[in-house]
UniProtKB/Swiss-Prot annotation:
Protein name from the UniProt record: Large ribosomal subunit protein bL17
Record NCBIfam families: L17
Subunit: Part of the 50S ribosomal subunit. Contacts protein L32.
Family the UniProt entry places it in: Belongs to the bacterial ribosomal protein bL17 family.
Gene3D superfamilies reported for this sequence: Ribosomal protein L17 (3.90.1030.10)
InterPro entries: Ribosomal_bL17, Ribosomal_bL17_CS, Ribosomal_bL17_sf
Molecular function as annotated in GO: structural constituent of ribosome
An example Gene Ontology biological process: translation
SUPFAM superfamilies for the chain: Prokaryotic ribosomal protein L17
Length: 129
């Protein structure tokens, strides 16, 4: 019986799934908000939250563990220098999933995944001359 094995396979092979989640983690760390399908967003949340928790304590061992998962030096640097200190006092729940309707082509449920304490970019108001 498969009790307690709630891994979403996302209709991919294990290597494809791991590579996809690795790319999505790197994109989320770089941009702090991404748009994806809802099942991918829920699976991304399961892998990115432990990475941010790992980054709260900066050590060589933790950086090596993060690099083993991310395989991107810039992402590891931003994770430990920016995101780790930012979420130091937060005991979890670093991401937010916002449902945003359905995709036009195949009606797949779409969602935004964003970091909770993301610095909001100010709206640029256009003035008519």
């Amino acid at each position: 019986m498969r009790h307690g094995h709630g891994l979403r396979k996302l209709n991919r092979t294990s290597s494809h799934r791991l590579a996809m989640l690795q790319n999505m983690m790197n994109s989320l760390i770089e941009h702090e908000a991404i748009k994806t399908t809802l099942p991918k967003a829920k699976e991304l949340r399961r892998v990115i939250e432990p990475m941010i928790t790992l980054a709260k304590e900066d050590s060589v061992a933790n950086r090596r563990l993060a690099f083993n998962r991310l395989r991107d030096r810039d992402s590891v640097t931003k994770l430990f220098n920016d995101l780790g200190p930012r979420f130091k006092t937060r005991p979890g729940g670093y991401t937010r999933i916002l449902k945003m309707g359905f995709r036009v082509g195949d009606n797949a449920p779409m969602a935004y995944v964003e970091l909770v304490d993301r610095a909001e970019t100010p709206e640029v108001s256009s003035t008519e001359a």
